[in-house]
């Protein structure tokens, strides 16, 4: 369920914000256009938002600044504390993950996440989307930004390129986490009752907007 990655995020919490803004060159391409990507999620979101994996609260802050109500579900205690400190009383945060989480304290119309859905296996991704379909009403939506590959060949090439560049930590991440292909995500959303569109943001990240039919 992605909780095996909690130790990683406990260690990363203190330097995460620096990483997303380019401090670690290995991940510079992954986080290229980071603020614009988050702004796009905000623009596509409704008024009442359930956010999975808010991390240090960067997307949450943008959602709150746009006067959206946000319930954040974050499994990492260190990340959750940083987010709560950053947002003060502008959002509510709770322990949980993509598959096991408390009921939001209000009726949601949008589920969002940034740079986190790949912590689930493809089977778990399907289970999660099925769950969300049971929560959302018709025309409500899921808006996720995450690394997705056009096909398996593109995934393999990304690993080779990382190794060629000496980015061995990035290569290891690509090998060990559960990055999906576009085809996989299209099938999951379609088969679980969503009409989805995908917009590429950089060499790694796509925004997935899935509207419940």
Swiss-Prot record:
Keyword Methyltransferase present in the record's keywords: the answer is yes
SUPFAM superfamilies hit by this protein: S-adenosyl-L-methionine-dependent methyltransferases
> Which positions does UniProt annotate for S-adenosyl-L-methionine binding?
53, 74, 97
Instruction: Give the keywords, sorted.
Output: Methyltransferase, S-adenosyl-L-methionine, Transferase
Determine the domain of life of the protein's source.
Bacteria
Record-linked Pfam families: Methyltransf_25 (PF13649)
Identify the InterPro entries for this entry. Answer: Methyltransf_25 (IPR041698), SAM-dependent_MTases_sf (IPR029063), Uncharacterised_MeTfrase_YrrT (IPR023553)
Select a single GO molecular function from the record's annotations and give it.
Answer: S-adenosylmethionine-dependent methyltransferase activity
Quote the EC number: 2.1.1.-
One GO process term, biological-process aspect = methylation
Gene3D superfamilies with a match to the protein in the record: Vaccinia Virus protein VP39
Q: Which family does it belong to?
A: Belongs to the methyltransferase superfamily. YrrT family.
Q: What is the recorded function of this protein according to its Swiss-Prot or TrEMBL entry?
A: Could be a S-adenosyl-L-methionine-dependent methyltransferase.
Q: What is this protein called?
A: Uncharacterized methyltransferase RBAM_024380
Q: Which gene encodes it?
A: yrrT
């Amino acid at each position: 369920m992605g909780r095996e990655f909690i130790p990683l995020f406990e260690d990363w919490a203190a330097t995460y914000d620096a990483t997303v803004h380019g401090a670690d060159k290995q991940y510079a391409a992954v986080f290229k256009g980071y603020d614009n990507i988050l702004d796009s999620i905000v623009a596509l979101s409704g008024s009442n938002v359930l956010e999975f994996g808010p991390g240090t609260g960067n997307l949450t802050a943008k959602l709150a600044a746009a006067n959206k109500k946000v319930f954040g579900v974050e499994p990492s205690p260190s990340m959750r504390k940083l987010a709560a400190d950053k947002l003060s009383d502008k959002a509510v945060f709770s322990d949980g993950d993509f598959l096991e989480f408390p009921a939001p304290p209000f009726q949601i119309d949008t589920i969002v996440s940034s740079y986190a859905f790949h912590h689930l296996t493809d089977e778990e991704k399907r289970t999660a989307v099925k769950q969300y379909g049971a929560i959302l009403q018709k025309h409500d939506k899921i808006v996720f930004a995450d690394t997705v590959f056009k096909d398996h060949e593109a995934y393999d090439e990304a690993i080779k390129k990382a190794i060629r560049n000496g980015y061995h930590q990035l290569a290891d991440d690509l090998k060990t986490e559960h990055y999906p292909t576009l085809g996989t995500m299209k099938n999951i959303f379609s088969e679980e009752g969503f009409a989805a569109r995908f917009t590429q943001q950089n060499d790694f990240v796509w925004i997935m907007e899935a509207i419940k039919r």
